[in-house]
Amino acid sequence: VASPSELDPFAGLPDAERLRRVPLLAGALEAAPLSGGITNRNYKVTLAAGPLVVRVYEHESSALAINRENEHLNSVAAAESGAGASVIEYLPVENMLIVGWIEGRTFSEADVRIPENLPRIADACRVLHAGPRFVNDFNMFA
């Protein structure tokens, strides 16, 4: 007999109800929280077609005053540049942004200090800045 979590990959997740309401995520095989995210709860959701990242946010939790519509449009621009994950779906009513999964890991401060990593970082910045202009400038101190 299968356990509830085997039948429902969202069982036990803080955003389970919200995740279950998204048609794209129906038939998910696995769902697991991802670390990080200052203003989001992030999940790796694996579908038959492959993994996605679901970013869930609360409007009132955004201490950085992030405009989520701008974040969506800027994510599209980053994807178009080739520096960001593809944007799969933006669901403002559910407070979600769903993007493609990129295999890898986030660099730590220590990783950035390794000289051999600097060309990769510079290349990623070059690709991003050569792409479409973001719809706004973000300054968390403004």
PLM ranges: what are they?
Residues 1-30:
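Juxta-kinase regulatory segment immediately upstream of eukaryotic protein kinase catalytic domains
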Residues 32-141:
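ATP-binding pocket architecture of kinase catalytic cores
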